[in-house]
Every structure is written in C-alpha cells, then in structure tokens.
Amino acid sequence: MAIANKNIIFVAGLGGIGLDTSREIVKSGPKNLVILDRIENPTAIAELKAINPKVTVTFYPYDVTVPVAETTKLLKTIFAKLKTVDLLINGAGILDDHQIERTIAVNFTGTVNTTTAIMEFWDKRKGGPGGVIANICSVTGFNAIYQVPVYSASKAAALSFTNSLARLAPITGVTAYSINPGITRTPLVHKFNSWLDVEPRVGELLLEHPTQTTLECAQNFVKAIEANQNGAIWQLDLGRLISVEWTKHWDSHI
C-alpha cells in the first residue's frame, strides 16, 4: 500500500525503532500520522513535522495496558477527527524479564487489546471499511533467546495472534502482517534483565554479534508497509527484509 495520503496510527512511534520508522513514514507523505505513546516527546514531534510540513502529525498519550474500553474511547476521538484510518501499527514493547506481568501486558495483551478496540471501527460485519494492521513482533518469536524466555514467549504469542488475524481477514475485512526485527542497536538491548538473572551479561553478549541500526530496520519496515501482504511474516535483520515461510506442523482442519 502506498503511504502517500494515508491516515496512520502508530502505537509507540517515538521509541528506538519507532522514531526512525516515523521519520521514514513522514518522508513518504501520509495525510496524517497519529502517534500514541506513553511518554510525550515534543522535540521528536516537532522534528517529524519539520521533515514534511505537508503531513499532519499529532500525538496522544497512551498506555497499551489500559482496558479495551479506554482504548476504544481514544480511538473514537481519533476516528471522529480523521474519518478514516488506513493502517494501525502496534509497536509497544519492553525487554525486561524481571517484569514478568508487565512484559506480557505490553508485548502481548496490549497488542491484542488495541487490535480488539480498533475492530469496533473497522470490522466489516459492523459496517466498517476494513483496515490494515502491522504488528511489531520479533525474531525471538521464531527461536527464543532462552535467557529471556518471558520476552521471547510474549513475542511468539504476538506473532501467533497476528497470523490468526490474517486468516480472519475474509470475515473481518482487516488484514495483518508481522514485523520481526533482529537484534537492533537500541537502548532496549544495551542493558536488560534476564529471567531470574540466569545471564546478567545477556545484552552485552548479543551486541558482540552482528546487529543492525534502527534506520536500517525502519527503511525495511516502510518497504513491508508498501508491500502490504496479508499474512506476511517479515524478518528485518542485518539490513535485509526477508519473507519468512512458516512451517505448518499441525492443522485444526476447521
């Protein structure tokens, strides 16, 4: 899908990968970029507006751990203003296996709840126009970093949820694909806690291996948005965009 003249909501669009992706998105000329984030960053918002003054960039404070009803209320405000929204990017994430409940709440439940809320406006069974969802998951959803099993499991859950959304598109009219970054040089990975402190140096050990920059990841993210392939599992790793073929080991046959 061409980004030009589209209305986009980006949850966590001011984070490490998020901010660089927001920069790349505004360069492509959407009509509106609505950023929902827990922490306001007026400097970053001003920068995004300056990159392309023709794009309307707005910010709303948002914590993905709030109840679905609160998210629906916020989205009602946004939809009333924009009339239509073309793309939702779910990008919230934390990497800290000391915070077990919050890791699951942000990385998985938050994605589910935000998606559930926007269905109120998009679901074609309710007369909605449909839409597109891009969920930022992780390569750890393919193969875990076993020292951070809670984080890895939360991302695997988000990936499975996204795959199901794509299969439900004929019913809901909402398509979906996953964005799965490899190890990217962000503040998230420089220092983080392993589960039960099984490996205090896990962040340092990861950074001893090849990584990618947030800009490389962001540029490939935009390519994935433009490809707009329902059900795609995109691996964004070492500056490359790779379409992953998922191996089916079991089928419900329904």
UniProtKB/Swiss-Prot annotation:
UniProt GO molecular function: alcohol dehydrogenase (NAD+) activity
Binding-site residues for substrate, renumbered to this chain: S138
Residues annotated to bind NAD(+): 10-39, 63, 155
EC number(s) per entry: 1.1.1.1
Pfam families with a match to the protein in the record: adh_short
Catalysed reaction, written as an equation: a primary alcohol + NAD(+) = an aldehyde + NADH + H(+); a secondary alcohol + NAD(+) = a ketone + NADH + H(+)
Catalytic residues as annotated in Swiss-Prot or TrEMBL: Y151 (proton acceptor)
Domain of life: Eukaryota
GO biological process: alcohol catabolic process
GO cellular component: cytoplasm
Annotated keywords: NAD, Oxidoreductase
Family note: Belongs to the short-chain dehydrogenases/reductases (SDR) family.
Assembly description: Homodimer.
Protein name per Swiss-Prot or TrEMBL: Alcohol dehydrogenase
